[in-house]
Design a protein with these regions (language model features):
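Acidic, polar-rich low-complexity tracts and alpha-helical solenoid repeat scaffolds
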Residues: 19-360
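Bacterial N-terminal signal peptides
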Residues: 7-16
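Positively charged n-region of N-terminal signal peptides that target proteins for export
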Residues: 1-6
Length: 360
């Protein structure tokens, strides 16, 4: 029996020793990658996702003001996030402590970190602090990723998230500078990529065969800004400009954003906010975008508000269609509590239409 116990202890010691963070072997890397991905990064992100979705389900939209592009908890509401965000944070913190494998070899393996999910865990810790409204701490974490993982995919993601933190802190000029610089950098990288495509076959063979040139080439490479980050920048810029009341700039960025691909609900939200901004400017495009929202079949309340606002933004176009839509809404029992809004909208379009007729 003692022999069996001794063997078990021996093999346990061998396994633990073989998975040391100091040993850079394939088995070690896979062991630490697996734990860093699922024990920290994946589980922590699931906690954040579930908490955010629960928040959205219980949240009530205020259609009397411009909708926030990215709904976030208020300072008071964020207190309900403390426990889940702390859990997510601790999971990632433990993973970083237990599984990071620092390394500084040059060439194609010149990563500062052999465990490829460590920077992802840092990013998740930053997001947990962001949603908890610990903004200075979140900013420091994203800055840490920028300074220590400059060759990883999360390098530019960390810079982007710094802008989101700065927006919530009210540092609009700093956030704007970051976001615009990312767009400029992306455009520069696109041009460089086109130049790389122009390399001759001889030059490509030279890069492939001469070791020193391979090393020099890899050392000179930098992380690429993904189109996914650029897609997130335009709604974020619009959010910044709305919060700073620069509505014309917000419209410009939303016009770009709605041309990109997003999940249906988020894109519908962008159309609604764009319609609201045009409505503020008494621009006929408001009516067009409210109709776009209706046609995208959103939830009942957003569809209702889009129909009402379309009528209120009426500028002499499609009078009959809008009136018909409002009269149809009066026949729906679900709208009983909103009848006052519908009658008000009918009166508004009738008044505007009569004014149009008199002006002819």
């Amino acid at each position: 029996m003692k022999l069996i116990k001794s063997c078990i202890l021996f093999f346990a010691f061998v396994i633990l020793w073989s998975c040391s963070t100091e040993k850079n072997k394939v088995l070690n890397r896979e062991f630490h990658n697996l734990h860093a991905k699922y024990n920290g990064f994946f589980n922590a992100n699931e906690i954040i996702k579930v908490t955010y979705n629960d928040f959205l389900k219980t949240r009530k939209e205020n259609y009397n003001s411009i909708l926030p592009i990215f709904p976030l908890p208020s300072l008071e509401q964020s207190k309900n996030w403390y426990a889940p965000m702390d859990t997510a944070y601790r999971k990632c913190e433990l993973v970083i402590f237990s599984h990071r494998m620092p390394h500084a070899k040059k060439g194609k393996n010149r990563n500062r970190e052999w465990c490829k999910y460590i920077d992802d865990n840092w990013m998740t810790m930053g997001k947990a602090r962001f949603y908890k409204k610990y903004l200075p701490n979140a900013l420091k974490i994203f800055q840490y990723v920028e300074n220590h993982y400059e060759i990883e995919d999360n390098y530019y993601e960390s810079i982007f998230w710094q802008s989101k933190v700065l927006i919530e802190m009210g540092a609009f000029d700093e956030a704007e500078e970051i976001l615009l610089s990312l767009i400029i950098k992306f455009e520069e990288q696109q041009l460089e990529a086109k130049d790389q495509e122009k390399l001759t076959v001889k030059q490509k063979l030279r890069l492939a065969l001469i070791y020193k040139e391979i090393i020099d080439y890899l050392e000179s490479k930098e992380p690429v800004i993904s189109p996914n980050i650029i897609n997130k920048i335009y709604p974020t810029l619009a959010d910044l400009y709305i919060q700073s009341k620069s509505y014309k700039k917000a419209i410009e960025n939303l016009e770009i954003a709605v041309e990109n691909k997003y999940k249906k609900a988020f894109k519908t939200r962008l159309f609604f906010v764009l319609a609201q901004l045009y409505h503020l400017e008494n621009n006929f495009k408001a009516s067009l975008y409210y109709q776009e929202v209706v046609e995208r079949n959103p939830d009942y309340e957003m569809a209702f508000q889009a129909k009402i606002n379309r009528a209120l933004s009426f500028s002499g176009r499609d009078y009959k269609a809008i009136k018909s839509q409002l009269l149809k809404m009066l026949k729906d029992d679900k709208n009983i509590e909103y009848f006052d809004q519908i009658y008000y909208a009918l009166a508004e379009i009738s008044f505007k239409n009569n004014a149009e007729e008199l002006g002819k």
